[in-house]
């Protein structure tokens, strides 16, 4: 985002759609500024996802429910999002946060299995795109945390007797709300260098992809060194894309 900001491209972006950590970045950026977004990540505690109790203790106490509750805690991340995400101060035209409906809150992981079956095999979509500016502050905060809640790794976010998980479970490239909003040019920032986006039945829309040349490494590594490496890699890859456009 810093490279897109410095090149002047970001100011022309009217809609943003994100899933998982992309949803968090979009929500914090849209609620504050590019400088504040960077400050959040450069100052995040290295043990941000550490649980108060060891996993073995929780397994002995809760058995399989411990897995359903998540291996790691989202408390610190949730607190950070509470401080920096506000639909009241959103300055982008519209931001969509992607979440995956994991089914009945009382069904545990079986609810997610059922939702996956319905989404992928029965084509009954279980992905939800939430417009940040239409949510209350509490709803916006819960939506961003849910979008980052990787099943088993983190606990689901519960709402209206359903459990909601990482948006990437059902849509890792959430461009649908952008197309429905009338966007005719979309920039996709990929975090998986092995993934190739294959647009289907998209007419009149130009798709750009910014892809990483290097592996991003551990997603739960919040050491200062790793965060700096990720930041630099993202900046260089985006800048390379920006510079390549100048000569097209």
Task: Describe each region flagged by the PLM.
Residues 1-19, 27-248:
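Patatin-like phospholipase
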């Amino acid at each position: 985002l810093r490279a897109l900001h410095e090149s002047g491209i970001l100011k022309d972006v009217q809609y943003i759609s994100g899933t998982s950590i992309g949803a968090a970045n979009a929500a914090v950026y849209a609620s504050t500024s590019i400088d504040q977004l960077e400050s959040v990540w450069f100052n995040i505690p290295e043990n941000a996802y550490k649980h108060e109790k060891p996993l073995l203790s929780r397994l002995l106490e809760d058995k399989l429910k411990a897995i359903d509750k998540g291996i790691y805690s989202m408390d610190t991340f949730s607190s950070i999002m509470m401080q920096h995400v506000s639909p009241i101060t959103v300055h982008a035209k519209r931001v969509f946060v992607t979440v995956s409906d994991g089914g009945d809150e009382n069904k545990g992981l079986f609810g997610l299995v059922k939702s996956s079956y319905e989404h992928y095999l029965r084509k009954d979509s279980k992905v939800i795109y939430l417009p940040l500016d239409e949510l209350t502050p509490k709803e916006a905060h819960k939506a961003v945390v849910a979008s980052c809640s990787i099943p088993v790794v983190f606990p689901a976010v519960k709402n209206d007797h359903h459990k909601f998980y990482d948006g990437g479970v059902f849509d890792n490239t959430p461009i649908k709300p952008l197309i429905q909003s009338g966007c005719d040019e979309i920039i996709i920032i990929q975090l998986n260098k092995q993934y190739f986006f294959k647009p289907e039945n998209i007419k009149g829309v130009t798709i750009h992809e910014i892809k990483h040349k290097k592996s991003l490494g551990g997603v739960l590594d919040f050491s200062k060194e790793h965060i700096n490496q990720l930041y630099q890699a993202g900046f260089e890859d985006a800048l390379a894309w920006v510079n390549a456009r100048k000569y097209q």
